[in-house]
From Swiss-Prot:
Annotated Gene Ontology cellular component terms: membrane; nucleus; plant-type vacuole
Lineage of origin: Eukaryota, Viridiplantae, Streptophyta, Embryophyta, Tracheophyta
Region (Disordered): 1-22
Membrane topology of the entry: Multi-pass membrane protein
GO MF annotations, alphabetized: antiporter activity; xenobiotic transmembrane transporter activity
Gene Ontology biological-process annotations: xenobiotic detoxification by transmembrane export across the plasma membrane
Disulfide partners: none
Protein name as catalogued: Protein DETOXIFICATION 33
Residue ranges, compositional bias (Basic and acidic residues): 1-16
Amino acid sequence: MGKDKTLPLLDPREPPELTGTKSASKVWAKEFGEESKRLWELAGPAIFTAISQYSLGALTQTFSGRLGELELAAVSVENSVISGLAFGVMLGMGSALETLCGQAYGAGQIRMMGIYMQRSWVILFTTALFLLPVYIWAPPILSFFGEAPHISKAAGKFALWMIPQLFAYAANFPIQKFLQSQRKVLVMAWISGVVLVIHAVFSWLFILYFKWGLVGAAITLNTSWWLIVIGQLLYILITKSDGAWTGFSMLAFRDLYGFVKLSLASALMLCLEFWYLMVLVVVTGLLPNPLIPVDAISICMNIEGWTAMISIGFNAAISVRVSNELGAGNAALAKFSVIVVSITSTLIGIVCMIVVLATKDSFPYLFTSSEAVAAETTRIAVLLGFTVLLNSLQPVLSGVAVGAGWQALVAYVNIACYYIIGLPAGLVLGFTLDLGVQGIWGGMVAGICLQTLILIGIIYFTNWNKEAEQAESRVQRWGGTAQE
């Protein structure tokens, strides 16, 4: 297949086995350190990119909150429900490129990566057209799910103005996966960081100084996402991405069926995870006197969202490492990368959990001045800490699945663990046994725990040599060569 062993971060050596001898332990520790360095070179910029892009919506909500309660509610609902739906679907559909581009890069089929990205554009822009009705008819959709009429109307109006962001998602995620698979994560980090600064300035200028209100918020958020797209695209067009970009090609329209299947599996896998904790907030709203529990859960989800940025960075890093090494035929190194990143992310999760538990009496006051809300948040902080720990490892295991191309399998696991076991258990504990928000969250955490254990089992019993062979077959079946 013309594999290039000089590709960055690819290493043809076999990883050491931990035999128990002192010398073997030293070698294993040395290799662990080297692999950790490779992972952090990818994860560090990826974490910064995730935080920067997450902050775009958070900053818009912050500035909109200065306009009034209705404006804040409109932006919050649109961001979390309408754009949240689109973000999850688009990110999931684009994640197929993590498998294909990563394995093509490892296999030395660099020129096929640009073709894969164009195929993903075709699929994601088509998907965006199918998602348009959600934006156009947002008010009745939100009202159907119980949102107050005046908030539904305001959020629906804001959703119409945010349609350009939908198509920015369609352009952005394939580009990001294309660059990420080549470990060009520093480029993404620089562009996202610069755009975040511009976004903060423009938000103040258009929302507050010029008093354009929600129109200014929409203009700023749309512009920021398109600046990210344009910046990354200019980098690719100017540098040719080390030969991975050879120009637009009609090959992008070939073999779309298999590509669509993998994209749909990726979207289903990710959306089932992405929406699971969102369901927690919705179900909590069905409790008697839900105002305080919903506020407490929202504070906890805010904390969990920020800590999740670390896991997302490691998700990207391990997806690249596994797909690259499998594509290069280095099955043992792919397995070793999984071990290293699992240990690293779990240790970080333990630290984050300790911080949450140690500050459970004080961090709620960063978000509220209500004693009742703060007390409820403190009461459920133990569940937050455990969720933070689980979610330090679970996205990493999902990243392994994406790198290996197991999206369809993990989607079935997610359906079973989250929606057949976790959610019903939460409903029984919360409503039937009258345990309230603690019961709802406890049941859903049980689903996450079960899913994590199943993924660990799948990874442990995986035949990595067979996965490397399947990666080679996948690259040949969905690409061949870019010259044909």
